[in-house]
Structure formats: structure tokens, C-alpha cells
């Protein structure tokens, strides 16, 4: 797949998923207050990983991912319709550990040292 086309599909996937969650089109109660960070489509365009986070416990995190993965068909259909895709990528939702780590690192660097440090 052309790299420019791939980036366009990934960007539209992030926008589409975020918009559908925020607008309430996803009725699953497990899916709320979710941030969509990035998407990665495979070379052949058949699979897509969508990376998300939410402010929640580890137990709730599994429920959020389960809710998103159960709504994947809705997201895929909407994305395919928007972009006119011949092959609709199968979406898999994953927790964005990389984003969490970078956020933790940023917080650690900006934290002011105290007398205990």
C-alpha cells in the first residue's frame, strides 16, 4: 500500500473512532472517556491497530478494550464508507502503553524537586 494512502487511512481512522465515541454513536456503556491516539494499518491494508487510553483502573481498562473491540464492525463500516475502501481493515483496539510511558516521563521531568529528593 502506498505510504501516503496508508497515513491518510490511519488519520481518518483516528478521527472517525474519536468522533463516534464523542458523539455517542457507540452505545456500549463500557466505552466512554476514551482517547484515541494513533492507528497503524498493515502493509496489505487488511488489519489495523488502533491505540487508545482512558483514565481508569486496570480492571476497567479490559472492559474498555472489550467494548471497543465489540464495536469494531461499526467503526470499520463507517471508515469504509467515508473513504470508499475496497478492502476494509479489521480493527483491533489496544492500550497505548507508549503514550502512557511518555506522559509519565514528561510528568517526572516537569515535577519540581522537593527537599526530600
From Swiss-Prot:
Disulfide bridge positions per record: none
GO BP terms, alphabetized: maturation of SSU-rRNA
UniProt entry keywords in alphabetical sequence: Cytoplasm, Ribosome biogenesis
InterPro entries the record matches: KH_dom-like_a/b, RbfA, RbfA_dom_sf, Ribosome-bd_factorA_CS
Molecular function terms from GO: ribosomal small subunit binding
Subcellular location: Cytoplasm
One GO location term (cellular component): cytosol
Gene3D superfamilies recorded: 3.30.300.20
Key word Transcription present: no
Known partners and oligomeric status: Monomer. Binds 30S ribosomal subunits, but not 50S ribosomal subunits or 70S ribosomes.
Function: One of several proteins that assist in the late maturation steps of the functional core of the 30S ribosomal subunit. Associates with free 30S ribosomal subunits (but not with 30S subunits that are part of 70S ribosomes or polysomes). Required for efficient processing of 16S rRNA. May interact with the 5'-terminal helix region of 16S rRNA.
Family: Belongs to the RbfA family.
Protein name (database record): Ribosome-binding factor A
Species per Swiss-Prot/TrEMBL record: Leptospira borgpetersenii serovar Hardjo-bovis (strain JB197)
Amino acid at each position: 500500500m502506498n505510504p501516503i494512502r496508508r497515513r491518510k487511512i490511519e488519520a481518518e481512522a483516528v478521527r472517525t473512532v474519536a468522533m463516534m465515541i464523542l458523539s455517542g454513536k457507540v452505545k456500549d456503556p463500557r466505552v466512554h472517556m476514551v482517547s484515541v491516539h494513533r492507528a497503524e494499518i498493515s502493509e496489505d491494508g487488511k488489519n489495523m491497530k488502533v491505540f487508545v487510553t482512558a483514565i481508569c483502573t486496570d480492571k476497567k481498562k479490559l472492559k474498555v478494550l472489550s467494548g471497543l473491540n465489540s464495536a469494531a464492525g461499526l467503526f470499520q463500516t463507517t471508515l469504509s464508507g467515508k473513504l470508499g475502501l475496497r478492502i476494509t481493515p479489521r480493527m483491533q483496539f489496544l492500550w497505548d502503553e507508549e503514550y502512557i510511558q511518555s506522559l509519565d516521563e514528561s510528568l517526572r521531568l516537569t515535577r519540581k524537586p522537593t527537599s526530600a529528593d
